[in-house]
């Protein structure tokens, strides 16, 4: 009876609590996400409504992702500049969600408030087949909701939308107050 309690330590007990293993099977994720899309699709009447519902669900996930990342980071500092927050999203958040960094981060030439995160082959759209009548549907609206929540809860309120351009492009449009604060910080 005592023998089962005195064996060598199991690998499970030796894992660190701070950085748990966060890998999820791709097939399990694909199944869960496709069911989520089907569930939302059965309750809406247009592609715009479906994308809005996916974005709303993404915002709920984004708030939790930010909490988890901040709790796990050792010596994490709070970003005060827009570029730092965007690099955090492109790097740490993307790695936590998809296992790699986003492909590109760009700023719009004509607008200081607009930035783009470009993902050539987004994992979120890989296993979703879209019927012809819904050809404008981009399920990356879910990812846009996640990014919007991470930025908003970090103190950088923004509106994030997903578009088809060079793969999938997330267009991030910050509120004017965020850009004004960023310029004031640069002036110090």
UniProtKB/Swiss-Prot annotation:
Coiled coil regions in record: none
One biological process term in Gene Ontology: vesicle coating
Keywords recorded for this protein, A-Z: Endoplasmic reticulum, ER-Golgi transport, Golgi apparatus, Phosphoprotein, Transport
The UniProt record lists the keyword Phosphoprotein: yes
Annotated compartments: Golgi apparatus, cis-Golgi network; Endoplasmic reticulum
Keyword Ligase: no
Record-linked InterPro entries: NO_sig/Golgi_transp_ligand-bd, TRAPP-I_su5, TRAPP_component
Gene3D superfamilies on file: Trafficking protein particle complex subunit 3 (3.30.1380.20)
Signal peptide: none
Lineage top rank: taxon: Eukaryota
Subunit text: Component of the multisubunit TRAPP (transport protein particle) complex, which includes at least TRAPPC2, TRAPPC2L, TRAPPC3, TRAPPC3L, TRAPPC4, TRAPPC5, TRAPPC8, TRAPPC9, TRAPPC10, TRAPPC11 and TRAPPC12.
Family (UniProt): Belongs to the TRAPP small subunits family. BET3 subfamily.
Protein name per UniProt: Trafficking protein particle complex subunit 5
Gene name for this UniProt entry: Trappc5
């Amino acid at each position: 009876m005592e023998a089962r309690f005195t064996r060598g330590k199991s690998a499970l007990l030796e894992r660190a609590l701070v950085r748990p293993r966060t890998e999820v099977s791709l097939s399990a994720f694909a199944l869960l996400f496709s069911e989520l899309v089907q569930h939302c699709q059965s309750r809406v009447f247009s592609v715009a409504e479906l994308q809005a519902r996916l974005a709303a669900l993404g915002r709920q996930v984004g708030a939790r992702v930010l909490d988890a990342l901040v709790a796990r980071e050792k010596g994490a500092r709070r970003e005060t500049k827009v570029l730092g927050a965007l690099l955090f999203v492109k790097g740490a958040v993307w790695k936590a969600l998809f296992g790699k960094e986003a492909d590109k981060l760009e700023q719009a030439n004509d607008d200081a408030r607009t930035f783009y995160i470009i993902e050539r082959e987004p994992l979120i759209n890989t296993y979703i087949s879209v019927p012809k009548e819904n050809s404008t549907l981009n399920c990356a609206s879910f990812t846009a909701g996640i990014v919007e929540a991470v930025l908003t809860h970090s103190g950088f309120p923004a509106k994030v939308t997903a578009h088809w351009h060079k793969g999938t492009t997330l267009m991030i449009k910050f509120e004017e107050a965020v850009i004004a604060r960023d310029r004031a910080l640069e002036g110090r």
